[in-house]
Amino acid sequence: MLLAIGVIVWCWGLLSRRPMLRRQGKQKGRCCVLFSDLEVFLLRPPTPSASPPAFTPMNELNAEGNATSSATESHSLANGHYQPVTGEEALDTRGPDDWTHSVVDPPRTLDCCSSSEDCSKEKLDERLSLNSCTDSGVRTPLCRICFQGPEQGELLSPCRCSGSVRCTHEPCLIKWISERGSWSCELCYYKYQVIAISTKNPLQWQAISLTVIEKVQIAAAVLGSLFLIASISWLVWSSLSPSAKWQRQDLLFQICYAMYGFMDLVCIALIVHEGPSVFRIFNRWQAVNQQWKVLNYDKVKDNEDHQKTGATFRTLSLPLTHRMGQSGPEGEPSTSTSSLMAAAAAAAAGTVTPTTNSVPPAAGATTEPQDSSEPSNGQPSLPDHHCAYNILHLLSHLRQQEPRGQTSNSNRELVMRVTTV
């Protein structure tokens, strides 16, 4: 009995000693790892500061790491117990020669890649500069719409714009007009001089892109026009036809007449409101489905048109000026006329509330009216101030002219308020 109990206790002691040994071995291994890490951290050779560490190929690093790890594992197994090897220990096992050999020059592949990218950018810049500049160093004209040169087609200058926005290709301009729906330049507001050559074949007509609002505008204009035509035709027939005599006498039809008249007014207002938008859409469609010839900007013709419009304005304002200048029987301006002319001159100078005294002319002094078409002393002529001039002219006609006898006896003061627009 005692022998059996002793055997059991001895077996129990053996079984309990093995976990203790294992725990002691684990603790000992951890302490060794900690001390080895501290040794590597404190005693490892410093990295050279002359050149930055290079990126060695991954296959070489893996081979060296595997070799060092296998060597350390075999050494630990030879000592009788297994000790895990960390990466820092593997690095510590490498000698100083290995550290010096690991620091190599940077790979040339990165330099080649960066240099090739720089070369490609430089070549692209050179191509752009060659495309934009001629051999003489003068910048070649480019289309302001597609930014291409003369190799894409003939460049035109269709408006008053100058500089980099002067030239454009004819197809690009026609396409831009079809998108905007306007035949005028958006920068200088000059109307392009175009000639319609011919309309394309109906089989070649192209549809233009429309927004939802534009579709609604077209539908409203078309339906309003149809309703207006139908209602007006019915009203004309019912009011003039002898067979509709009984309709004109019926109260219900008279109410319908009033309703149709009101709806006709609404349709007319709708057509007037949506008409310009529909007209612009039609211009866009016409620009796409018709062949055009765009003309270059002619400065001489443009100046002639400006001169014609200026001459027309001056001819319209000349009779009014002569009426203001010649009011007396002997060509002498009256007091009201002279005061009005002085007020107009003050308004032209920027005076808001001019005050003039009508002084009678001295004996023997004569005044000659100046022609408004010729400016005096480099100042703009009187008809050019159209707003103030028209107001003063109306006031001069509304005011009664004074007799010549009364103007010599007393002086009257005329105060006028002129607002410049």
Curated annotation (Swiss-Prot):
Present the record's domain note: The RING-CH-type zinc finger domain is required for E3 ligase activity.
Which positions bind Zn(2+) 2? C159, C161, C185, C188
Q: Does the keyword Metal-binding apply?
A: yes
Superkingdom, taxonomy of origin? Eukaryota
Its recorded reaction(s) are: S-ubiquitinyl-[E2 ubiquitin-conjugating enzyme]-L-cysteine + [acceptor protein]-L-lysine = [E2 ubiquitin-conjugating enzyme]-L-cysteine + N(6)-ubiquitinyl-[acceptor protein]-L-lysine
- Per the UniProt record, one Pfam family is RINGv
Q: List the RING-CH-type ZnF regions, as residue ranges.
A: 135-195
Q: Supply the InterPro entries for this chain.
A: MARCHF4/9/11, MARCHF4_RING_CH-C4HC3, Znf_RING-CH, Znf_RING/FYVE/PHD
Leader sequence segment = 1-16
| GO BP terms, alphabetized | protein ubiquitination
Where is the segment annotated Disordered?
60-79, 319-385, 401-421
Alphabetically sorted, this entry's keywords are:
Golgi apparatus, Membrane, Metal-binding, Signal, Transferase, Transmembrane, Transmembrane helix, Ubl conjugation pathway, Zinc, Zinc-finger
What is a GO molecular function of this protein? ubiquitin-protein transferase activity
* Organism (species): Danio rerio (Zebrafish)
Name the chain's protein. Answer: E3 ubiquitin-protein ligase MARCHF4
Q: What does this protein do?
A: E3 ubiquitin-protein ligase. E3 ubiquitin ligases accept ubiquitin from an E2 ubiquitin-conjugating enzyme in the form of a thioester and then directly transfer the ubiquitin to targeted substrates.
Topology relative to the membrane: Multi-pass membrane protein
Per UniProt, the ranges with Polar residues bias are: 65-77, 367-380, 403-412
